[in-house]
Amino acid sequence: MALSLLSYNVSDLCLGKPPLRCLSSSSSSVSDAIAALKSSEDTFLSVWNCNHDDDNNTECECLGKISMADVICHLSKDHDHSLCALNSSVSVLLPKTRSIVLHVQPSCSLIEAIDLIIKGAQNLIVPIHTKPYTKKKQHNDNVSVTTTTHSNGQRFCWITQEDIIQFLLGFIAAFSPLPAMSLSDLGVINSTHTVVAVDYHSSASAVVSAVSNALAVQTSVAVVDGEGDDPFTSLIGEISPMTLTCCDETAAAAVATLSAGDLMAYIDGANPPESLVQIVRNRLEDKGLIGLMSLFDSLSSYSTSSGYSSEEEAPVRTTSYGRSMSSSARMARKSEAIVCNPKSSLMAVMIQAVAHRVNYAWVVEKDGCFVGMVTFVDILKVFRKFLENDM
């Protein structure tokens, strides 16, 4: 039965997928990206090298993807010139490597798609055929965000690691006995030495670097309590880029000033504790970070910059420091880590990760000892080897 999967291609995974919304790398700024992300139901937006406001025959190419977490990391690093950083080209938010987003044809086989994901791709861009489309402007005319439509009417969607895992779950019986086997027996656990982790008391600079690294590999930052010679004894929680995507740009001030433990508390739930809000403000003042201070206090920056006359007219407004109303409504997540143990079955971990919309799960022993992490890529490697042996 597993051999029947060889007949599927990525077009089978595109059914029901909405066309991508995009930003132009040549005409969009970081500020545009913030407005677009706040008004979008999507966590990520694609960035392209063609300007969809112009009617030309230039071949479109997706350069990468961005989220609010990318914005927050960018602003927290450039804290001396935060307001200027908002006017930078959106391209500064893109990762240095272009290989994480790849164009493929609809005829690309499922096996080929899995191989690309294993080699490092995070999203596969696939052309889709839809009815003729008339581009509609955003309510904010200063933001150039459209559904990706080329001059020949071509539009695109993308396939993620999660899409492939969900598709394989529909054929899980074909991989017997793998689904019932434990993580330890399958050897898919990444040790603590290979995961992105920081100590609970780590400084803000260490946190910024760790979050950036986790973004690049599409995982998360483990917050640990180190004891003795082993700095990664127990897992306390995580700082997830997916949690940061629920925040707004003012969270950059918290990332730039708080320790790992305090940042976990700040982004946990809907509203940060007032005590932490005051700590962030005090540290911004102590360090003379005027740019971040101005950003931190601009709670209505999006509504104001967009020129809306009232809160009712604005598609998104900020309800509290660091938290976006639309984002928290569609993906409210606490910083509590998603965990399993080495004896958890492969299928249980897959379902757990998919249910929480993450690409990984932390692995912890029953006594609380931190073991490591298992990712969707690790799981896909197991399935790929199984299919290879069956071919």
From Swiss-Prot:
Give the matching Pfam families.
CBS
Report the Gene3D superfamilies cross-referenced here: CBS-domain
Domain CBS: from-to ranges: 16-81, 331-391
SUPFAM superfamilies on file: CBS-domain pair
**Database matches in InterPro entries:** AMPK_gamma/SDS23_families, CBS_dom, CBS_dom_sf
Q: Does the keyword Repeat apply?
A: yes
* Keywords (A to Z) from UniProt: CBS domain, Repeat
Q: Does the keyword Ribonucleoprotein apply?
A: no
The GO annotation for biological process reads: cellular response to hypoxia
- Report the domain of life of the source organism: Eukaryota
Q: What protein name is recorded for this chain?
A: CBS domain-containing protein CBSX5
